[in-house]
Amino acid sequence: MNAGQPITLWTVEDVSVYLGVSVQTLYTWRKRRTGPPAGRVGRHLRYDPDVVRAWFTDQSKAA
């Protein structure tokens, strides 16, 4: 992370588009603890894009 640079986090909708899955699928994965990790900002879920990409890469290797 660069000092002074704003942190860009993805919304559930952003991750949905990136992975090509529905928003509901992301919520289901979160409930089952199988999807990419997310954090809360207030009451909103946010995803670190680098973590989502790494999770996707790991899933691709496992397939």
Predicted regions and their residues:
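Short intrinsically disordered terminal tails
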Residues: M1-A3, T57-A63
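Short helix-start
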Residues: L9-D14, P37-S60
